[in-house]
Amino acid sequence: MNYDLYSKTNSATTYNQRGQGEFCPTAVLATSLAQEVTSTTTYSGELDIDLVATGTYAYINDEVVLVTAINTTTQSLTLTRGVMDTVPVSHAPGSRIWFADGAQGIDPSEYAAGETVNARLLTVTGKGTLALASATTDSLAMNRRQNRPYPPGNVRVNNVAYPAVAKGDLVISWAHRDRLSQTVSLVPQTNANIGPEAGVTYTLRIYGEAGSLRRTYTGLTGTSQTYTLADDTADSGLGRPNAALRIELESNRSGVISLQKHSIAFERAGYGLHYDKYYGGI
C-alpha cells in the first residue's frame, strides 16, 4: 500500500499528480519527552515498527530526532534529540513519532517563498485509489527552509544543558553549526564546533520572570556570552535579580534567521531567591 501525491498552490484551481510515496512506520509516545539532548522512552500504537532501523531520522511534531536504539519487545526507543535544523523541545505523551527516513513522497515542483502549497495523499490499495475529493488536505507555507542557517548546538548555561536552576553570573555557551558542511551524518547537539557557515552571527535574548524581554545581544560571532548578576539586577527593574529567566538563541545570516531557536527557561537561586527550594546549594 502506498499513495499518489497531488498538490497545488492556494491560487491554483486544480490539483496535479506530482509523484508517489510510501507510508512510513509510526508510533505514539507512551511517556513525555523532556527538553534534553538524549531521551529513552516507550511507545504504543505502533505500525510497521519492525521496518525502523537505527541510524535513521524521525519527526516528533516539528523536531527531528535520530533513532539510536529500538527494542520492539520492550517497546522502547533511544533518541538523539534536535538534529538537522531543529532543537530539542518538550513533547507530551500521545505525541506521534513518524519514522520518515526513506519513506518520503517528493514533489519536484518549484515554489516561491511565501506561497502556500496544498497537498493530498491518495491511498493506493489492491482495491483501487482514494478519490481526490475524499482526501484530506495538508498545507505548508514555503519559508526557504533549505537556505536558512542551522541554529547553534550544544547550548549550555553555566556548563549545564537545559538547567532547572542557575546561580550567579550566567555564562551562556554554544557550538557553531554549518548546514553546508553537515551533509554526511546527523550531528548530535553535544558535538563541538562545525563551521560556522560564512556570515552567520547569533542573537541572544534574555527574558525576565514576568516574561518581558530584558536584554538583547546581536551580531555575536563567538560561542559564549556572559550575563552578570549585576546585569540581571539592573535589567529586572525589581531591585534584585529575576527569580526566573528564559533565554532565546538563534542564528542569523544577513537577515536570514534559523528555522528554529533555542528557548531555555530556568529558575534563579541564591541571594534569597527560592531559598526554600535550594537551601544548601544547587
Language-model features, listed with the residues they occupy:
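Recognizes extended acidic, P/S/T-rich segments that occur
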Residues: 104-110, 184-242
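An aromatic-rich alpha-helical recognition segment common to small helix-rich domains
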Residues: 139-142, 152, 174, 204, ...
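Autoprocessing Asn-cyclization modules and mimics
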Residues: 1-81, 86, 138
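Pro/Thr/Ser/Gly-rich low-complexity, intrinsically disordered linker/stalk tracts
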Residues: 133-185, 191, 254-282
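Surface-exposed loop/edge segments in extracytoplasmic proteins
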Residues: 12-19, 65, 207-218, 257-260
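Beta-strand-rich modules
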Residues: 113-132, 229-260
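Leucine-centric amphipathic alpha-helical interface motifs
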Residues: 18, 24, 30, 98-113, ...
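Small/polar beta-strand repeat architecture
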Residues: 66-143
